[in-house]
Amino acid sequence: MDTETLCLITADSGKVYGILKAIFGDESEIVKKLIDFDVSIRVVPLNLGLLNIFRDNAADLDNADLMKRRFGNTMGSRIVEAYRRSQDSKYKRNVCKTTGLLVCLFGGGLGLSREADKHKKFVEGKSHNILSVEMLKRALSIGGQNVDANKISSFWFATYTIFTTVYSPRLRYQAGSSKRIIALSESRNQYRSNLFWDLRDDSSHEVMSMVHVLSALFASALTAYISTRVRHELTQGNDERESLNNVLVWLKTLTFEPSTIALIAYIWLVSPTDAQATITIGSVMESESSDDFPDIVKILSYTSNTMLPVQLLEDGRTAYCSVADGYTRHTTALTLITDYNSSHMSDKFGVLINIVKFEHAYALHYVHHKPRDGKEMTITSPSSEMMFTSVVVTPLSSYPLIHARNAVIDWLRTFVHMFPDSGSLVIPADSYTWIHNLAQDMFPWVQLSTTLDIRDDHYFQVLCDCLSLGRDSRNHAKVEKLIKYMKASVYNFTSEARGNMLLAITVYK
């Protein structure tokens, strides 16, 4: 998904370049030049909850009493004010003359509009009001602006799924006394956390809170990285205006997968400083050689007290680090090799559970389960007739067998967002490719595991059917039926709803 669809690209003051001081030094003439120029680019994530509110209440947005009853006085007033501004022909966007971007002075200062004091009163301290108008225009397709809220919802739920399955478990070892990180690491549990909204009645609110956290981390990281790109442009002999506009053109060409955003958010969250996080993100996104890979792998690796030294494969183009966690080995690798899913890599590291693709490099996460003392390990799996059978588990088949059930639930929760809330299920033809690509990003291990002797496992077979939606007419009707059944439960993910979903998956035929 491209940057403009995921975010609002706005103009801010020179205070955004403050992070460059920590990276390049306070005395850097180029950094001082940028701060004095006082124009920067800031990425602001779309508030998915607000987008859905605008869309779901489109007919009542001018009804102040009704909006206040539904969303409280503060939010209700904000919604109505945004709607009335969007309809006011006299309402003018404050636009940066240098970049043509919407002005939002999150960083304070007056550099973007120093020639007119009236803009100070309009912008400073009221950025949220301006952003609300812009998001409303997108949600209601006003002035040619539009977003596909269904696809954006699915995209962010996919990001949430990847983050909580791949990265959250690592945070248990890094939490220390930080309640914030502990809450992130346990985001799938059914309990309240100070990090998330207090007024939630089910875990759908918890998911939305996590989406807010992830989108904020991503936006902060991308804004900082953009600043380093502007500085680089300036070192190439361009003036400030050219540098900003060159970076803006580049920024609008960027596309992101959910796995990329999850990794960037993780780096921003766990790095000791914002400056170090920015350097790491830049190194991963721009690397054309493996020279920096060992240092980056240390940051990306699964964290525990048994981390092994970073090693290089014989070719020198792949750096990796393995971590033993009980009877499970987690391996994180950075490679320039495009054939990353080769049997050689799987035999060495285990099941490839996550792939993050950058321009030149690939970040890979593997899991290898080792049966205790070499004994044969079995798990109990239901068949479609609800007769339970024992399945022999090998190191390579263990991850697919253990995680297939939850993966089916995550797939359904992700893609139900794309379909109408009522009426018949109609999937647009162009959505099949979108669904397939997003699912491959979430579950790369499914395709790589189909060669194993586990296709008779019921949950794994259901997951394979879901991932082949639209490609196999025999399975299409069954998956469609499952999606329809899930609609009532997917937004109310209580214990009862989860039980209903598990029952539906178990009896899936």
Swiss-Prot record:
Keywords from the UniProt entry: Host cell junction, Host cytoplasm
Top-rank lineage group of the source organism: Viruses
Protein name: Movement protein
Coiled-coil residues: none
Originating organism: Rice dwarf virus (isolate Fujian) (RDV)
Functional note: Transports viral genome to neighboring plant cells directly through plasmosdesmata, without any budding. The movement protein allows efficient cell to cell propagation, by bypassing the host cell wall barrier.
Compartmental location: Host cell junction, Host plasmodesma; Host cytoplasm
Keyword ATP-binding: no
GO cellular component, one term: host cell cytoplasm
